[in-house]
Structure formats: C-alpha cells, structure tokens
C-alpha cells in the first residue's frame, strides 16, 4: 500500500486578488509539498516544489506556517529554474535572505537532493538559471553530487532525459539511468496518455510503485 499526501502552501488568496499584471505571475505560483508513504511507513520521502515562487512568496509562507513538517524536504526543486530570486531580488549575489536560509534548513538528512529543472547552469548570461544560485544550493549539501540539473544529469543521443527518483521503504533513490522494465513501461504509458510531458531540458519524475509524479503532475492507481 502506498499513498501520496499533497500540501498546498501557495498561492495565497490575497496574492491572487492583487495580481493584475503579467509581471505578477510569479507571486501567484503554486508551492507544494509531496509526502510519500509506503508499506505503512509514513512520510518516507518529502518533496518541496517551488514553482516560480520568488523570495517574497517564501517569506509569506514562513510567516503563515503552523507546522514545520509541512516545509521539510528530502528533495527540493529549485524555484524559477534555479533563479537567484529565491535568495534575493537585487544584484547583490552575496547576500542571502533569511527566508532562503530557513527553507533550505528544512532538509531532513544528509542525503537530500536539490534539483534544478533548467537549462545547463553556466557562469554567464542569459539567466536564469543563475550560476550564483547553484553555488548557494550546493553549499547546503553534504554531497555536492546531490545537486542535479535536468539539462545535463542524463543525456542520451544528445537529448536530456527525465530525472527519475524512486521512493522505496528506505527512502528516495536516483534511478535515472536504470529504471526497471515496470517503471519504464509506466512512464511510457504516462507520456502516451499526455499525463506527463518532457521539456527539452528534461522533466523531474518521482515513482511510488506504479505511481509517477512529474513536474507537479501525478500518474498511477496506487
């Protein structure tokens, strides 16, 4: 028996009501926590997905949060394609706001993964992705290799492949390069049905038994 619990942190009603311009769209981005349970073991893996939320949204979430476990994570998806706006919205690439420190400190153990769903992160323009953001994220990881970039993590025939994370009773595992036949079949069916889509930079995928969550979508019967 496996199940998925989804907690919606944002957008907030007042932010939606105040958003009038195209430039306001990041203020109403969806921020979610996925909590995966398996075989009677609750919350084996938690994933925090930040959409395009900038630091103001994260501060709003922190100000209103009443349960720290709803912000805990084993997998963190970098907001806004690894944009610096999670840390600060100025040109000062050395000043990290407390909101970013607080969210990143919610990592549950040393095996946490941070995933940038973005183009390859280079120390050059245009951006995002911001190279400085990548540097800050990696500072928070004991294993620097646990920072994954969808554009380059797995490439076959010059095409970025989806990052596939499998949740087992011992936690989350990166199975990008060695999906089982059953998992590959389920993934292919999800793509065929249109439930999942792969961008040119690759997609972020999670599977629990037959279930696969990718880029905020959920596929499966369990």
Protein language model regions, located:
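Active-site-proximal loop/helix segments of hydrolase catalytic cores
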Residues: 12-110, 114-125
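Flexible, acidic/histidine-containing loops and adjacent segments that form or flank the divalent-metal
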Residues: 1-47, 119-222
């Amino acid at each position: 028996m496996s199940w998925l619990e989804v907690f919606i942190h944002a957008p907030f009603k007042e932010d939606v009501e105040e958003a009038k311009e195209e430039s306001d769209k990041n203020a109403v981005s969806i921020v979610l926590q996925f909590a995966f349970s398996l075989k009677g073991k609750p919350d084996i893996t938690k994933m925090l997905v930040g959409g395009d939320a900038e630091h103001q949204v994260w501060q709003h979430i922190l100000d209103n949060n009443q349960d720290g476990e709803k912000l805990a994570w084993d997998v963190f998806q970098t907001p806004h394609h690894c944009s610096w706006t999670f840390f600060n919205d100025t040109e000062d690439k050395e000043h990290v706001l407390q909101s970013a420190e607080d969210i990143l400190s919610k990592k549950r153990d040393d095996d946490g993964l941070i995933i940038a769903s973005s183009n390859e992160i280079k120390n050059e323009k245009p951006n995002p992705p911001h190279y400085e953001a990548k540097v800050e994220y990696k500072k928070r990881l004991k294993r620097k290799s646990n920072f994954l970039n969808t554009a380059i993590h797995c490439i076959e025939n010059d095409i970025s492949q989806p990052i596939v994370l499998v949740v087992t009773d011992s936690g989350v595992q990166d199975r990008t390069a060695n999906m089982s036949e059953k998992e590959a079949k389920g993934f292919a069916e999800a793509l065929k049905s249109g439930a999942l889509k792969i961008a040119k930079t690759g997609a972020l995928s999670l599977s629990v038994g037959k279930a696969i969550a990718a880029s905020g979508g959920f596929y499966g019967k369990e």
